[in-house]
Regions:
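NTP-dependent small-molecule kinase module
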Residues: 9, 33-38, 58, 62, ...
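Short, positively charged and aromatic/hydrophobic N-terminal segments
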Residues: 9-11, 15-24
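Hydrophobic anchor at the beta1->P-loop junction of P-loop NTPases
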Residues: 44
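P-loop (Walker A) phosphate-binding loop of NTP-binding proteins
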Residues: 47
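Conserved lysine of the Walker
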Residues: 52
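Hydrophobic positions on the alpha1 helix immediately C-terminal to the Walker A/P-loop
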Residues: 55
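ATP-dependent small-molecule kinase phosphotransfer cores
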Residues: 70-118, 122-127
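A glycine- and Lys/Arg-enriched "phosphate-lid" helix/loop adjacent to the NTP-binding pocket
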Residues: 130-173
Length: 203
């Protein structure tokens, strides 16, 4: 039996299914990527600090899409902040909650900014790839390091003893694995990134 939880987010009706609380481009490696055309949504993935929410808001406005921040959806559904969920449930417990909610997202014509740890949920990523074009906002480690402040306050899912560098090295291959498009973002302004992505969407 499918369970649907409906609520309004940012004036948009979002449906969460089965959630219970408890034009082609290539990367530098030559990997073929799918076009944004024909996709219902655009899904942004990447490290914390990569600019997913910032780029997402501007890109949504440019395309006439709605904007959805999956971290805020998680907080809306659980009534708790991300760092509170990590403290209460541990990293693994938080990742399970995140995966369940992201795997049930159901919306159209939206730019979805995801949490940096979304790629640990295989079920969620398969679903997001089905409902949208997944775009990896790729930044070098130095750029990420310069941008980030207190990781704990940001609700970053760090395991005991894990450093930001460890996290970066662990996650980057997963971002590459799930992305339809890899968008290089080093030394680029938000408007430049948005222009490049919008050009792909309208190609």
């Amino acid at each position: 039996m499918e369970v649907y939880v409906c609520f309004c987010y940012n004036k948009m009706r979002v449906t969460i299914k089965n959630y219970e609380k408890s034009n082609t481009i290539k990367t530098r490696e030559g990997k073929n990527m799918e076009t944004m055309q024909g996709k219902k949504n655009i899904v942004l993935i990447g490290m914390p600090g990569a600019g997913k929410s910032t780029v997402g808001v501007v890109l949504a406005k440019r395309l006439g899409y709605r904007f959805l921040d999956s971290d805020l959806v998680i907080q809306e559904q659980t009534k708790k902040l991300l760092h509170e969920l990590i403290t209460e449930h541990g990293v693994d417990g938080f990742l399970k909650i995140e995966e369940d909610i992201n795997a049930g997202l159901d919306c159209e014509q939206a730019v979805i900014a995801t949490g940096g740890s979304v790629i640990y949920g295989e079920k969620a990523m398969e679903h997001l790839r089905e409902i949208g074009c997944v775009v990896y906002l790729k930044l070098s480690y130095k750029e990420i390091e310069d941008r980030l402040g207190d990781l704990t306050a940001r609700g970053v899912a760090l395991k005991n003893g894990q450093t930001l560098k460890d996290l970066y090295n662990e996650r980057c291959p997963l971002y590459e694995k799930y992305a339809h498009i890899v968008q290089e973002c080093d030394h680029k302004r938000v408007r430049e990134i948005v222009h490049e992505l919008a050009s792909q969407a309208n190609a």
